[in-house]
Amino acid sequence: MKPFDFVKPDDQEGVISALAAHSPRVRILAGGTDYLVELKHVSQSPGTIVDVSHLQELRGIEEVEDGLRIGAAVTHTEIMAHPLIEKHVPAMIHAAHTIGAVQTRNLGTLGGNLVTCVPSMDSGPTLVALEAKVTIIGPGGSRCIPLTDFFVGPRKTILEPDELLIDIVIPKCNLGKPTAFHKFGLRKGQALALVNAASSLWVKGGKFKDVKISLGAVAPVVIRCPKAEASLEGLPISQDVIQEAGRIAVTEAKPIGDFRASLEYRNDLIEVLTRRTLNSAIQTANQS
């Protein structure tokens, strides 16, 4: 491991000052489940590491005026056990349960999973399907943007070296919205997704309303499928239209073939998981 400087500020303002002072050779440390592994293999020192794991401003899950706020340093285990998540967005519990092993979920944070920005991340699709927003602070102040705008490419977000992700907010209008997440990997546990998917929707008079479909591991970043969504809007619920939406979703994705799965196999998974998430969300809607 290469030598580096270590800073542990007392608050958010101290973090921003430290990031600005040491930019661009600076990295943020929260759970460290990805970065500490990476750090052992880098060819040069990262410069300065800024520890934010202890900051209470980045913790907590609470209802706010705009919706449900989840601090960026909240762990996956905390998400799985929190009553507000169970009440408003239970699909997040299912997604969090598929992330890594128990130790990874105990240490790894929601913000870290998003910032790492691996296309196969399991936290992304559910949040994208629920139109989540993220809050970023930096020397110039704060900004709130859609999560879909946060992702730029594999392991690349819009965060500047002197900026910090502080929370994720699920809009109030989507709290309690029937949502489902499904993942397919090579193993039942501790597996990267070959494809993962989430769908959210309302059912009004037996018809689809406000459908959102999101896919992971099928493009450089987690994506929405607006054409598949539009194909369902306002239509009576039937397996025929759900199957057609799955076929349309395939055309909106850009999967690759690699040693884990061929392009053709991933296309099949896109269609299947789109159908499964839609049907699961419908089932949730019918039970509510």
Segments predicted by a language model, with ranges:
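C-terminal structural segment of proteins
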Residues: 1-288
